[in-house]
Design a protein with these regions (language model features):
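Helix-coil boundary and interhelical linker segments in multi-pass alpha-helical membrane proteins
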Residues: 53-63, 128-129
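Hydrophobic cores of alpha-helical transmembrane segments in multi-pass integral membrane proteins
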Residues: 1-53, 67-86, 102-126, 135-193
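Membrane-helix interfacial "entry" motifs
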Residues: 59-63, 93-96, 134, 138
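Cytosolic, membrane-interface loops and tails of multi-pass inner-membrane proteins
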Residues: 86-98
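Juxtamembrane/interface segments of multi-pass membrane proteins
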Residues: 95, 127-130
Length: 194
């Protein structure tokens, strides 16, 4: 899809430009940093995601919604795990940003679930009206990933309530598992419904 590829290329260029600006202005601190520059790449990326959703097939609005929510959900859980690694090497950092990403993952989960259940969705796979090619096994695997994803988010939030440094290590490990189950939730559904 040409629009998707062009938007991706421009978004990558905008991301690199924001990195260069941040590196050049590093000594000046946060004051005076052009905050709008950080919004250019996500805006262009959204254009690419909409184009990808329209190209995915099926009802256009549902395909776009699934693509946008899926990108936000998988982005939140991936960013949370990556930020968790930063906390492992910088233990004195405040936990607020990590907790915020974990909260966003939990907030996005019901929307991801609803988008994947919306007909024709995973309910059809679980009911057997859509064949997953494995006698229903992928539908049950998807269900397990879905339940495990929100359970791991809840466990991560509980771990981050603890004050010890080991809590951040535990949270990062739980987020590793949450990435696996979140991708299972999203990608298995896409494979079954393709």
């Amino acid at each position: 899809v040409p629009v998707r590829e062009v938007a991706t290329g421009i978004a990558a260029t905008a991301t690199f430009a924001a990195l260069v600006v941040a590196a050049v202005r590093r000594s000046e601190g946060v004051d005076g940093f052009p905050l709008g520059i950080d919004l250019v790449a996500p805006a262009l990326g959204t254009v690419g995601l909409v184009a990808a959703g329209l190209d995915a097939g099926g009802p256009p609005a549902l395909a776009v919604i699934r693509t946008l929510i899926g990108a936000a959900f998988l982005g939140a859980v991936s960013d949370a795990m990556l930020l968790g690694h930063w906390y492992l090497v910088q233990p004195g950092l405040p936990r607020g940003p990590l907790l915020e990403l974990v909260r966003w993952t939990g907030r996005l989960w019901p929307f991801e679930l609803a988008a994947l259940l919306w007909p024709t969705g995973m309910v059809s796979v679980l009911a057997g009206t859509v064949d997953d090619g494995y006698g229903g096994l992928l539908g049950w695997f998807w269900l397990a990933c879905t339940v495990a994803s929100i359970a791991l988010v809840a466990a991560t939030r509980a771990a981050l309530r603890e004050r010890q440094y080991s809590a951040v290590m535990s949270a990062t490990g739980l987020l590793y598992l949450a990435i696996l189950t979140a991708f299972g939730m999203d990608l298995v559904a896409r494979a079954c419904l393709a």
